[in-house]
């Protein structure tokens, strides 16, 4: 767990894939430490994985059980996804964007992570550049590295949650092949407006493909998070990715999708066929049922908005701790840079909190944001966990 908060970025800049792969994802390292502590104590609370503590809707479970028992459906092999799910997703995205989405443009995969990796391979395999938000979800960095792409960054303002468009325009260049957006974002929970999306498209101006990761789109707390797919007459090719893991709580079932321009579909189909072959049809039938229960996402959105409010208020009362108010997603980031001791990193601080308060958090250095911690709302004893974290800092000399 030791290491410099900028280690991932430094490994990338040095083009050292081996060193990059040697850097463990702090989230899973903290999960393992929490699991070890749970063997001794029964009061450990994990604020690590963005995996809702609420169960999957019973109708979704029943749909998967029925599909598993039906050999005609459980053995289906479709590299692009079961046709019925592609049609259901097209209807859903048509409603979300207000623009017709053809089922032929929908590519289903085992979660959206595999799609982002394959899109990096497809678009930037020749050493082209992938432009990422900073802070970033580490999947983006690793996907680009595995594709042999180069990485550049644009910044998200930590106070406003808005894109620093000057940094975006400065980072764009003739080698840029792909620009990744994430709204609401992970780890900040920042939300982009339609005006923001339009300004991104104008800045890119057709020079690269814009990939909009909208996995938390239905987890926007205070206002609607618009889809990039709703943009009228975009100048740039647009890919929208989404997943059933968050609001619809199919976290471990691994079903995601992308809506892609027609010219990318054949090549992406080939990549999917050779790197994945197929997505398990059983959870795909669960996903079809999930799209009939969108109220599930609304219920969890309201629950997590309340938890966000409590955490911002309670942690905001602690000297030297600054909650960065999230507008959506499953996560809240807190700035603790001024509370780090000499030689202490956010990783060692997270270990100390786990040891003393029995609350597992994720070091922000994993996301290119050293000096912070990421907390997930997805814990039934969330308020208690926040009180413990606050007490840890209040009692710390």
Feature-to-residue mapping (PLM):
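N-terminal small-domain helix-loop-helix segment of the aminotransferase-like
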Residues: 2-111, 118, 396-397
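Generic structural signal for small/hydrophobic residues in well-ordered secondary structure
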Residues: 30, 47, 64, 89, ...
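Short beta-strand
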Residues: 44-46, 322-327, 365-366
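PLP-dependent aminotransferase class I/II
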Residues: 57, 237-328
